[in-house]
Amino acid sequence: MDQKVRQFEVCTQDGSVDRHGNPAIRANTGKWLTAILILVNQGLATLAFFGVGVNLVLFLTRVMGQDNAEAANNVSKWTGTVYIFSLLGAFLSDSYWGRYKTCAIFQASFVAGLMMLSLSTGALLLEPSGCGVEDSPCKPHSTFKTVLFYLSVYLIALGYGGYQPNIATFGADQFDAEDSVEGHSKIAFFSYFYLALNLGSLFSNTVLGYFEDQGEWPLGFWASAGSAFAGLVLFLIGTPKYRHFTPRESPWSRFCQVLVAATRKAKIDVHHEELNLYDSETQYTGDKKILHTKGFRFLDRAAIVTPDDEAEKVESGSKYDPWRLCSVTQVEEVKCVLRLLPIWLCTILYSVVFTQMASLFVVQGAAMKTNIKNFRIPASSMSSFDILSVAFFIFAYRRFLDPLFARLNKTERNKGLTELQRMGIGLVIAIMAMISAGIVEIHRLKNKEPESATSISSSSTLSIFWQVPQYMLIGASEVFMYVGQLEFFNSQAPTGLKSFASALCMASISLGNYVSSLLVSIVMKISTTDDVHGWIPENLNKGHLERFYFLLAGLTAADFVVYLICAKWYKYIKSEASFSESVTEEEEV
């Protein structure tokens, strides 16, 4: 007994192991020492990624010769692909490689893509010399050069996308959720992770954004490559101290087993109160049994023990056929995923709003007054106000708002806003951001310059600083939506699907970018005629960008109504270990 108590005090209790596969020693592994390495790594990787992404729309117009709508669509598709690759990274991590190996491999791919882009830009794409600035576009490129460019940027997408969901979950793995102190740190980690992400992009949006706007594209891309390489080295330095979780069997196999087993037993009545449900012991240390719930009753058939199951067990020796009989925990894992999907779908439209910051906000800013005396402000650098807003609201929420809401909360849980409530607030603020952007565009058009009919540069006397409110509102909405989303999916996902849960957040951004691209194409097709330039033409002074912003505000408002219904319907996951705690089956939204 004393030995067990001693092991409980010395080792982590969540099933994490060290790099040799032994139970992780609490004092020698994980916690903030390794988490800080991961946070700095995230900051450097984000600096590198946004060193490319923040001005990619301008690179496509000035160097690759694309118009505004085409460039905005291509940026949306590229950003969407980045986050689609997050699903691949999550699958490999949860099923085969583990989070550490997955992070290392995809970061190496990320560095390789950045180096390829840096080399190809300096040696091949900037022709003639000195091109790539606003008044001096580059000449058309050959098919080979264009293919090389897209190969490099999509290799960057593969590396960064596959790495992102795993580094977030790997950072959370450094804290033992079964320990009260480390459990609190684990929750706080996601806020600091998102803060590191934004602070990392601050340098890209200001310094690198300025040099790239001046045509120094190779310098900006090489700085990004160097930052990514430094981040990879820093990540590897922490190898001896990291805590790991052993990869589970493929979550998709477990998912399919439940569906197949339930289908095979389709004729069984699941509404009978005395069901003989099968539940096995957990396979991995630290795993928790998930308690049976009444939703999605048709899936319970997969856990009903039938005479045929017993007969097959006798024939095979000692085990049930996993494609005929699944444990209650395995069935509940599928239910967890199905319950998450409606919430996840409601976050996609928010990502449509969010992606405008990297595309149409930049195009809009470039068509405003960007000079302060002799200094020219790059339109992309305005996203610095988004980053400052994120930093401010993360600090304000953790230090002031969360404790305030906790005191006002009269329920037994005595906690602040739930993750679902915070995500709803994020949607409301996003609506305000689109309305603000539309109002700014109305005023920009009222102050357009006469000569803008032949030039889209500085085509309005309205200062670019009028964009500050829309950037600040987007930043505030991110703190409530994306941080809440990370915490929500990570806490509600089964043990073997933690990386997949983080990938859901990335996939939401991905689909948001694709939907944004589709929406722009549809709007342009409908609004463009022989004598009308459409809402988002190359010369914004001949369009109606404000209508597109107001359209997004209306769609997001409708999405918010649907979200309220889905959030009210959602039932929180309950595990065996937490059943004795005062956790209600439903939480108020």
UniProtKB/Swiss-Prot annotation:
State the name under which the record lists this protein: Protein NRT1/ PTR FAMILY 7.2
Which coarse location class describes where this protein primarily resides?
Answer: membrane
Name the GO terms of the biological process aspect.
nitrate assimilation; response to cadmium ion; response to nitrate
**Expression sites by tissue:** Expressed in xylem parenchyma cells within the vasculature. Expressed in siliques and flowers. Higher expression in shoots than in roots.
Q: What would be one Pfam family of this protein?
A: PTR2
Localization: Cell membrane
Q: Which residues cross the membrane?
A: 32-52, 78-98, 105-125, 147-167, 187-207, 217-237, 343-363, 377-397, 423-443, 464-484, 504-524, 548-568
**Per its UniProt record, what CDD domains does this chain match?**
MFS_NPF7
Classification via SUPFAM superfamilies? MFS general substrate transporter (SSF103473)
Which family is it part of? Belongs to the major facilitator superfamily. Proton-dependent oligopeptide transporter (POT/PTR) (TC 2.A.17) family.
Cellular component, GO annotation: plasma membrane
**Phosphothreonine: modified positions:** 102
